[in-house]
Amino acid sequence: ATVKVDNSNFQSDVLQSSEPVVVDFWAEWCGPCKMIAPALDEIATEMAGQVKIAKVNIDENPELAAQFGVRSIPTLLMFKDGELAANMVGAAPKSRLADWIKASA
């Protein structure tokens, strides 16, 4: 399953995570975000222990979106050891999402 992250737990759940974390920046009104949500849930389950998938609602956390320069959604950011390691903008099929996550993690 994916983890909901906001300003209060971004530091602990993402930046201080021992495993790589993919952060999905999304919003309720974003069709493509809703399209990839089930795929991200499946990938989170399939890759449990290897990678964590977190979700940030940009309407509730505009400062996090601004901090990482997120201008369009969905945007996926991969963090490793507290550093931004890779990013992917836009929706994609599950296979492509999984390949990107595996390659980046």
From Swiss-Prot:
Residues 1-105 form the Thioredoxin domain. One of its GO terms (cellular component) is cytoplasm. Keywords: Disulfide bond, Electron transport, Redox-active center, Transport. GO terms for molecular function: protein-disulfide reductase activity. Disulfide bonds join 30-33. It comes from the Bacteria. Belongs to the thioredoxin family. Participates in various redox reactions through the reversible oxidation of its active center dithiol to a disulfide and catalyzes dithiol-disulfide exchange reactions. This is Thioredoxin C-1.
